[in-house]
Structures are given as structure tokens and as C-alpha cells.
A protein has these predicted regions:
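Short coil-to-beta strand junction motifs in C2/discoidin
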Residues: 47-58
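A short beta-strand element within beta-rich, extracytoplasmic domains
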Residues: 31-44
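Catalytic micro-motifs at enzyme active sites that drive phosphoryl/nucleotidyl and oxygen chemistry
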Residues: 20, 43-46
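Short, charged juxtamembrane terminal tails flanking transmembrane helices
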Residues: 181-183
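Surface-exposed, low-complexity/disordered Ser/Thr/Gly/Pro/Asn-rich loops and linkers
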Residues: 1-28
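Terminal, low-complexity interaction segments
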Residues: 13, 27, 39-40, 50-51, ...
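A short, hydrophobic C-terminal helix/tail in secreted or cell-surface proteins
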Residues: 162-179
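Residue-level detector of short, conserved catalytic/binding motifs and their immediate flanks
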Residues: 18-20, 33, 55-57, 134, ...
Length: 183
């Protein structure tokens, strides 16, 4: 099987979280980063015939050097929330055939257009120092009346160094690429 997504289902007192830790090994201070992914819904369950609320996997990010560490970033409260990257299930048009259990009426095809949404956001104005870690997290807690098994797929990440690094790179490239004149 070649198609997989990381997923979470917060329900009752269960709290689920997925994330990653990235280290800045560029040798430069990075001033922005962009995250892109596909939000997929694979199953739904609720207490009625239609969802009573939306289900949300809240996105947050943070850096090492504070209270967040590689050991605790999935539960650390100091991470910075960014709603633009939250994975939110549709709040309407999800008629449920069963409240719970292994029922085919609960299943959704997270690869179909109705249950797959592309998300992208850029965080700028940061100072991600060389050697420091960046923590990215999606957390899913219980949503009253409705829960969805939500996945993160096709994850992409890029980061940009501070402007002075770009200037140095461009000047160096220009010096190499410019033809030399012979007199």
C-alpha cells in the first residue's frame, strides 16, 4: 500500500497529537517557513444523525530553547497556535449512519475532493537560529457531539534565510556567472 497519512482521533478523554521536529542545519538564521499539506477525513462519528459541531486538529509551532523540547512538544502548552494551518472537518453535510462502531456508513474517502482540503501558510518574522529545533504539531481533542478521524498527508516544508544570506548568495553567484573580459 503506497498511500498513507498520519492521523488522530480525539474522543472522550483521549487527546491525540501528531507532529515533527526539524533542526536548522543550514548554518544561517531562518526568518520564515512555509507548511503545506492535505487535510483528509477518513471516518466520522457523532451522537446524532448530523454533526453538532466541527472537529479541529489545532496546529501549533515552537522552537527549542524555551520550555518545548523534543520529549514534550506534542503536549507542551507554550507552542504558538496558527489557525491558518488547523485541520477542520466540514461542519455540515456529513450525515452519519451510526453513532459509533465499525459501520461502513462512518467511513469516508480522504482522497476524494469532498473530504480532502489543501492547506498552506507561511510564518514570517521568526528567528530560527542554526542548530535550534522547530516543532510542528497538530493536536486533536474531543469535540462535543462529533468526532472525525483526520489525517495529514502530502506534507511539504520550506524555510527561508534572513535577507543578508540571500544577498551573499546572489553576489557570489553573480561573480561566478558573469563572463570575464579579456583585454
Amino acid at each position: 500500500v503506497s498511500d498513507r497519512a498520519v492521523a488522530a482521533l480525539g474522543s472522550g478523554t483521549f487527546f491525540g497529537a501528531v507532529g515533527t521536529s526539524l533542526v536548522n542545519n543550514s548554518g544561517a538564521t531562518l526568518t520564515s517557513f512555509t507548511v503545506s499539506y492535505a487535510h483528509e477525513i477518513w471516518a466520522v462519528q457523532g451522537t446524532g444523525t448530523q454533526n453538532a459541531a466541527e472537529d479541529r486538529m489545532a496546529f501549533a509551532y515552537g522552537f527549542s530553547g524555551g520550555t518545548a523540547t523534543a520529549a514534550n512538544y506534542l503536549t507542551n502548552s507554550s507552542l504558538i497556535a496558527l489557525a491558518d494551518l488547523d485541520a477542520v472537518s466540514p461542519a455540515s453535510n456529513m450525515v452519519l449512519g451510526a453513532a459509533s462502531g465499525d459501520n461502513p456508513n462512518r467511513q469516508r474517502d480522504g482522497n476524494s475532493a469532498g473530504f480532502r482540503t489543501l492547506k498552506t501558510a507561511t510564518v514570517s518574522g521568526i528567528s530560527w537560529e542554526p542548530g535550534a529545533s522547530l516543532y510542528l504539531r497538530w493536536s486533536d481533542s474531543d469535540s462535543p457531539g462529533f468526532d472525525a478521524t483526520q489525517g495529514i498527508d502530502d506534507f511539504a516544508f520550506s524555510a527561508v534565510p534572513e535577507p543578508s544570506v540571500w544577498i551573499s548568495v546572489m553576489v557570489g553567484a553573480a561573480a561566478v556567472l558573469l563572463p570575464r573580459r579579456r583585454w
